[in-house]
Structure formats: C-alpha cells, structure tokens
C-alpha cells in the first residue's frame, strides 16, 4: 500500500516547518493537540461537567484510524497489523526497517492507551531522543497530555503519556512491581537490550510488569523469538512479531576505491545528494567537512537559502564560527561534541533539504532525524574504547538503514570507502592502464602494521548478514535491591525470581545469585535493611513456613538511583568543610564536581596541558629524556581534595552500602574556570577544545543543577551565590535550546530546570551577568600579569585592542610599576566598578577594572562599555568603547 508518512523526516523543533516524527511526515501537518483532543480528558472538566467515559479498544483504534485518514495518511499493511494487534491487547515486537513508520505505530499505541485510561510510557536510550520525542508528542497530543522524566528534568510528570529514559522506567518497575501504574510501554531503540552497561534497564520491565502491554521497536533486532516467548510467559498475553515489512525505499550498495573527495564529487554529479558521510571520530568528521568546503558543494541559490534559514542562530563560539563558514559552503557537521543549538540547526537545515553534505559520526544510527539519500562510510572499522575492530552487522545496518528518504527517493544509496592503501593501489593501477610492463612494475602499498583492514568482501558480508541475536544483560546492584525492598514483603524472593526468569545463561544466573546474597548480607549487616520472619496464621497448616518480610530502616533520598545518586554523600561531605576557610567556596565546588560524570574530552585536554607544562619544566631542569617519559606517566589533571574525599567516601559506604555502586571522580573544571577567571569562550580557547564545547556545556549545566538544587541554602556564602547565578547565566546564554523548545510548545514556566528570568528588564539575571563581566575583566588582569600578550590580543582584537596595542599598554605600565598583582585584594569588588546609568536607554554598562600594583597607586586599568544584549545572547562579555591604559589618559579619551 502507498503511504505518505515517514519517521525519518521528523523535526526536533516544534513549528520549525518540518514534520514531527509522530505526525505523519509528509502528510498534512497536524493541528496542535488534534489527536489528544480525540481522547477523553484525564483532567477535571473546567465547566464542572462529568468527564466522558474511557473508550473501548475498538473505539480508540477507530478514532486513531480516522485521524490518520483525515490527514491523508494511508497506513501500510504492517502498521495496520501492528495497531490491530495492540488494540487486541497483544504485545508487539516491531522490527521493521528505518523509514517504515514505527513512530506512527507508537503514537497509535500511546493514544489508544491514554484513551482507555491507561498510563503510557515512551522510552528511549538517550536524553536528546527523549526530549525530541517529548516535543513531537506535545505537538499532536497536546501539552497537558505529555510529560518528560530524564532524572535531571521533570516536566508534567502526572500526564497520561510520559517520555523517559529506559532507566527511569526500570527503577519504577523495581520499586513498584506488579502495582506500578504502567498500562503500556513503547520501547524505542530496543537493540539497547544487548548493551553491556545499560541493557539491564531494557530487560527489567519485561520481567517485573506482568500487567503492562509492551511494544519493542528497532530496525536491527535480529532473532527475537526468545524475548517474545519470555514476554508471553511473564504476562500471559500473546506477543506478535511484525518484522517482515519491506523497506519503503530499497537500498543499493557500492564499494569504491576513489578518494573521499572524488566519491563525493561523483555522487553529487549523479544526483545522489544529500549525503551523510560517516566517521568514527569527531575530529575526522570536521577535517572532512573543512576539506570538502573548498570544493564548491553548494550552488549560489543553496548558499543564499542556507544563510536565510540560519538567521537568528548565534555562531558566537569558536566552533560556531567554523560551522558558520562550513554551512555557507553547503557542508554540515553533526556530532555529540557540538552545542545543542548547532546540532538542531544542522538537523533543521537537513530537514528542509538545504544541505547537500553532512559530515558526522555514527550517532546517525541513534534515532536522530536527518533525512538523507546517500550514506558514505569512510571506514568499516571503529575504535570501541578498547581496540580497533570491524563493524558488527547491527552497527552497519543501524547506519546504512538511514539512507533513502521515504516520500522523496525511489532508492537509497550506501557507499563504503576502501582503505587508504587500497585507494592508492587503485590509482597506480589506473595510471598504468593496460600496459603489462607498467602493471608489473607497480609496487603495491600494504596496510600499515597493526592496521585493522577491510575489503569488498567485508562490505558484502555486512550487507548480507542479519543483525546478531540480542544478548540479554542483567546486573544486580545495591540500588536495585534497595528499590525492590521498598515494596515490602519477601524482597529476596523477588530478586531470585528476577534472576531466575531472566534470559541469562545458567552460569550468569549463578553469579547474579551470589552477588544478590552479598548485597543483602551487606545491607542487613549495616542495619539499612531488616529481615523479619512473620509466623504463619493460627489456622495455617502445621508445616507452613513463616512469611519473610524485608524493610528499610532509613528514608531514601528523593529521586533515589536517578541521575545524581551521590547527592546524599555530598550533603554529608559538606560538613567536613570550614565555612571560615579562605578556600571554602572553591572546596565546596570541588566536592560537587567529584559527584558529577567526567567530561572526558575536557579532562584529556587538561591532562595534555599538565603534561606539556611538566615536560617543559623537567627539560629546563635538565632531566634526561627517558626519565622525563617515565615521570610524565604520573602527571594528570587536577583532582582537588582527592585524599579527603576518598577517605570520607570509604566511611560513607560503610554506613550507606548502596553507595558502593558508584564512584567519586575528583576533578577541577568549574573550579579551574573560576580560578583562571575564564568565561565559556575563554576556557574553550585555553584548553583548545572548540570541537568539544557541547561536552563542556553539558558538564556546566550538570554542575549548575547540582549547586542550585543540592547545596543547602545555609551552606551558601555570598561568593557561592554569585557563582551559582553566573553559572546559570552562562548555561542559559550559551545555549538555551531546551528552554526555547518548551517555549515553542507554549509553556516556559513548566521547565523547572530553568531558573526564572526577570520580566521587562534589560538584564534578566543581574547577579549572573555582573559576575560574568567581573570574571572576564579579571581574566585580562591575570593574563597581563603573566605577560600572555598574544592571548590578550585574541580576546580583545574585536574591540580594538590588538596584541600590538596590548604590548604597548603593558610596556607603559611597567615603566611605572614592577608587577601586576592578582591576589585576593586585586580580585576584590573595590577594584571593579559598574555604572548602570545608561542600562535602560542604551542597554550598556560602563565598567572599570583597576590593576593592582605593588605601590598601591591603582592608576592603570581597563574601561569599556558592556553591550548587554549581545552579552546575554552569547554568554560572554561583549564590549564597545574598550580601552586600556593609565586612568587619567582614559578619562581624557
């Protein structure tokens, strides 16, 4: 049957002009909340009338079918089959290809569930995908009917449809078991069932929610008969497999020995655009994009259209400037290290058909909505964190399956590049032509030693091989056991049942039972859990065994086992700090940072910088080269309070055993930014991590949330309150994509992760903006004290203070003074002033930063006007009328 819908043309920004993944793709765009309006309301009618009764399954199916028909969407056979199975109360495993409308089936399931009065869940593996689907569902079901839970974000959590990460649902299932209010679940990207670290969260709900209807979705499932049989056994309901749908857009494959630039040129000439070029590192993706940008990828008309569509996007960061140039040439970049606003822009431009080429990583395979015609694989190997290896069949099909745009293409194209040495050999052969003598003289290049290679047979084997059977994963942790104990009753028996009924091998089950025994023993010995035998009732048989009851003796923290499981430890550890200490605020920040997930790319850059400094110092001290190499292995990034925190955590784990599931990770990212007076842009520049600025932003957002939500008010001094305001200001200013999307959905107040902003004020967050400007100016003082004139020139060239002008200014300073001080007095508010008199009329602050000298003359400094609008838009201090020198000269100017 024909169909005009696809789940590959989804928009991540409601109202952006592209279709929602749940709204039917190229069908008529749904009016806001039009499908949700067909369901009886979950809320008390405003007019005081009686709520309408819930629909029957048949009625719910008919209403959904009518909604799709009214919008010109004709369901494919496999979609209708799956929806009818769901309406009949069966489970469905939907293993159809990418682009075959799985999202529309999921929407039907969620609608039919809520219309029957069932609470429904949509789960996905990553927060970005959860967020995307949340906004898509809001568009078609209405704002009141959809909520989101990701551990750090809670929106409308009482809604009938909840979008969440798989771990959220798994923890609820452990905590509530059969009594959980979970009517139906659509599990997207179900191949994560086999993920070694996270697969447990996909298996646990299937084992512990016997009254829940499931739909398991993925384009690369492989053999799922064992999963289907297990689901039927646990729930008593039939599990239907819908796995034989044809690809709506068939694929063709080509293995090429041309250079990547040549491959792209040939594909463009052959009308095979848009292309997504897959790399297995972010650096490689950017390198290719920069190379291709010089090849005239886009026409003048395309470049103009891209420029128009990108209006309103701020490209203020270092990577942003690179991306702006690349987009202007028709080349996009897409990977996880980018700021969200840049990724969303690239996706939006792709959805509008404006980008001929996108260079990205294999994140393409994780549900992102980038409609493309051709996938080009630059390699058939990847580094998996341990070693280089060839792609597995599932990985290959996840990526290759994104080729071909339903509703646009008659076929999709998948191209694999040969290894570089094979491409070179092909060039030599082509140059020799048919001349036997020249052919004999060719010295073929070999793969480098240790290189994991591939060839055409590798490619063909991947095409023909079905995805591997999903290997089930299960683990037992202190947190999981605690959650099960919360139910009351015989928690150990329930954990035994969880293990015994799982799909693990007998050997794995035996190991899990031993682990469960160890955890229960630890929890009981520590007094956190008590085990009680309840005697049988008087009328029970004489051989009746006593009932066993496990109970907690402590109150669990709110949001236990979610995204910040070490928050209780942080609260306890704060008592170790002396509020009167000069380092109190920075030490508190270090404690917070130790509980956060590592931003690995940032820490690697810190370690590189530390090792470079150490090598230079050892070389200057005359240390022999071999010894330098040996010593350098012990040099790493800063880990403040490491010994204090490790000792405190060991003691804490004795009292709170479930903390053993987690690890502290001392580091200094936020602290380093503060101590070096760096703003976001300056810190990126300092470490040379422009390609990972999205990683830094996410880390700072987590740090802000922890400081703002976890640190008690009584533990916050004035300095810390300033820092929290500044950090929130920076995070919102650098990238407010999530806030913007929610505003587009109509209700900015519901996003509790965003601190409130002022209304009708030029400066929305005065405290945060003030600290941002103070830090920016004191960073210049610090750089001047260290005589880092080149860095000063790079910071201030845009407002007239080049490296040469800074050098002249500092030369003049040092004719009068020996040094520039950077101690506590130099950083104090007495050395910094703001004149706000023109804030409302001109949207500027007049600022003055004094340099502290050894004589206390305080006669040199920086004066300038802060552009408040640009500063708040970009999250960095933007100046006008900026000058440096002796104050009497500046005042004359």
Residue ranges and their predicted role:
Residues 121-123, 131, 138-147, 282-357, ...:
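Conserved C-terminal RecA-like helicase domain
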